[in-house]
């Protein structure tokens, strides 16, 4: 089938281009460090986002109406969070704002472990919304500023998206194993702090870039 052959060729061509981007990034230290940090804190972020409702229903026995309310809280607070972090990045740097955001994500993991009531879950959901969209948009913005100069960045952003999808897959796999071993999602949520910690350490290694960005801003 010519169509299948054509689609197959496109598939392998796309992966070859991603591989070339990967090889190129290996020679760019700042990008390599940033993507390493992005991967690890994305493992935590994407897993929490996907499992928040499951945590509420399975651990706290929340009803559907309560879970819907939590989602609405997250969405509304996310608007304010994005504005606050955008302002913070303007006054400092994207890298500094990401550090603050990832640190808050770590605190969320600890808070989730101790949540007992619907009210507490709403508060955690609100804080989640505050940092969710902000860290995601700041990460993408920072990545775009670090890319090598070229007319077409499509493949570079495809690589970024693949990294995010891999982080999601790895996170869900890890949580599945942890829950199977412990039988409690609370411990799984607490364990996610490890991924955020690794990501934060990587981002702290970008001090040189942060100073450079601050100088440029000033």
Please provide the spans of the model-predicted regions.
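Multi-pass alpha-helical transporter architecture, strongest
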Residues: 190-218
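Structural signature of the two symmetry-related core transmembrane helices
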Residues: 96-111
